[in-house]
Amino acid sequence: MAIVKCKPTSPGRRHVVKIVNADLHKGKPYAPLLEKNSKSGGRNNNGRITVRHVGGGHKQHYRLIDFKRTKDGIPAIVERLEYDPNRSANIALVLFADGERRYIIAPKGLKAGDTVQSGVDAPIKAGNCLPLRNIPVGSTVHCVELKPGKGAQVARSAGAYAQIIARDGAYVTLRLRSGEMRKVLSEGRATIGEVGNSEHMLRELGKAGATRWRGVRPTVRGVAMNPVDHPHGGGEGRTSGGRHPVSPWGMPTKGFKTRKNKSTDKYIVRRRNK
């Protein structure tokens, strides 16, 4: 994997920094594991905008990723690594001994020809998936289940990982990249290692158009709007009317807590670093 800084042959290329991975498959993805991925433009069934700054972008197929890893005891060979436009991590196409193919999140160090496995008897090796109760304390894991059988929900993006720091009865304690320490049911599964493509954070898109290719539209500041459009709108010159920063719907935007699910607070041992 290499970090390439483009030559300034045009204003749009001057600031581009690309991540080039020669190990990624250059052909088409595996068709049986593709699904249609329709764009909504941020509109709901009434045609009204419910998510701002969404629209346009390149057409994409959704890759069906195996987040549950339930084929226990059947080894699988990594056929190739692929780019996935729907996530920051790369994905791996694996071929099981019974002939089935699935996509999984590609962990750091995984390459074509490697063998991965899932189940309680799987060895502690990058890419193998086991219940948390069978993984040694101190291990680094990713693709962690919060609810057993639901599929991985934690540490799925490029470079993400969690560390098992304690085991207590039916729960294990994880330290996340954010610094948060959280209890998770030990019956839930996790994959050994950290997610690959950690250099993803170093890329620079270089121009506004590259953001538009990804389906992201421009953001207009509230103070540049009219009073009918935003609480900060109107006034002569740039003035917010002396009001603390709020969203278009009047919700404070800096330091205001919006977490609603208080029932799971008991699982958080320590809040994230700020």
UniProtKB/Swiss-Prot annotation:
Q: Which GO terms describe its molecular function?
A: rRNA binding; structural constituent of ribosome; transferase activity
Keywords tagged on the record: Ribonucleoprotein, Ribosomal protein, RNA-binding, rRNA-binding
The record ties this protein, via PROSITE patterns, to: RIBOSOMAL_L2
Output the SUPFAM superfamilies linked to this UniProt entry.
Nucleic acid-binding proteins, Translation proteins SH3-like domain
GO BP terms: namely: cytoplasmic translation
Naming one, the record's GO cellular component terms include: large ribosomal subunit
Region of interest (Disordered), residue spans: 223-274
Q: Which Pfam families match?
A: Ribosomal_L2, Ribosomal_L2_C
User: Which NCBIfam families does its entry note?
Assistant: rplB_bact
Q: Which family does it belong to?
A: Belongs to the universal ribosomal protein uL2 family.
Subunit comment: Part of the 50S ribosomal subunit. Forms a bridge to the 30S subunit in the 70S ribosome.
Function as written in the Swiss-Prot or TrEMBL entry:
One of the primary rRNA binding proteins. Required for association of the 30S and 50S subunits to form the 70S ribosome, for tRNA binding and peptide bond formation. It has been suggested to have peptidyltransferase activity; this is somewhat controversial. Makes several contacts with the 16S rRNA in the 70S ribosome.
* Protein name as annotated: Large ribosomal subunit protein uL2
